[in-house]
Amino acid sequence: MKRLTALDKVKDLTLYTGTFGREKCTCNCIGCTQGGIIKEKEPYQGNINQIKKIIEKLPNLENAYLLGNPDISVDTDFCNEAAKEFEKNNISVMFSTSGYGGNKTIKRLVSGLNFKNIKYVSYSVDTLEDDKIHYLKGTKNISLKDIEESIKFCVDMNIPVKIQPTLWEYNQEDYIDIINYFYKKYDIKWFTFHAGSFESLKNRKVPLKHIEPLKWKEIVKNIQFIAEKKKLRIVVPRIFLNQEEMDKEKENIHTYCANGGTGLRIWLENNGIRCTYCPLLAELHPEFTFLIDEEVTHFIRTDGVCAVRREALDENLISKSWNGKGAVFKQNTENLYNVCRFFSIREQY
């Protein structure tokens, strides 16, 4: 572990406003990522003094992305209060939400804010089919109608919206319909994709599978094609690279882990403000987190395959890899190398 940079380099914050995890969430997502670091913590709701301390400790903070506890529909009023504190200090805010609660929730969330200071609201929309929504969200108390009601409010108020699907094998064909639907109906041109991963699901069995390497490469290619045609802004993790792609990435392969970046993930806890530069790693290895009072950030440089790259894949897929370790997959005549999910295609057409 290296101590490389001070907190004054941080410009972008992603914030969990407490540690309720699945316990009090409005949904019960079967692929919920709040299964690692959070399940060991005492359930806790953050307070405004912690927000003020974050602002004090991060003097060059420009953007605060609020995820809630662990969704903004759980602690909507506190997320609103926190956003106002960031806004008061000339920090732009963003929100991530399942869309739970529709109009009622989004109106409470942004009440009293200057909408021009809201960079976007991100909606987790994994499918357009209500039965699939209920399955993935683990509840029938949310529907596409609720999500659309919330999105329409933002669109009407000129608050930027991005759609963030998480794709598993279960819904791997839904991405085209998602893009087309929101593009045509609401003129939404911003989509950021996640690949469903298992790093924080390892100690509980879930009926989900990771998308196969060749299928994922097909999805990435199709998303790029659609994005270019419709002039979209996209982010999509690459995950599996062939040899030619790996050769191009060699110079940058350790950049994130070794040098960090300008982004920080924070959880508000009962006994402090916990930080990490790599949320994936932190879910499995809490030693790569630190308390904000330490005044220093921690990074790790890895040679070869970071543990998280393997553990983000399900056991079935790992068993299909070349040496059973999830590092290399032999597909037809080429090798596909499993790389960190932070290596993403970020394009705006």
Q: What is each stretch, according to the model?
A:
Residues 1-11, 35-39, 272-349:
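Flexible mid-to-C-terminal extensions adjoining Fe-S/redox cofactors in radical SAM and related proteins
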Residues 15-19, 95-97, 123, 165:
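Short hydrophobic beta-strand elements that form part
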Residues 34-37, 48-130, 160:
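Conserved SAM/AdoMet-binding glycine-rich loop
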Residues 41-45, 116, 126, 130-273, ...:
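Radical SAM enzyme [4Fe-4S]-AdoMet core and its adjacent flexible, acidic
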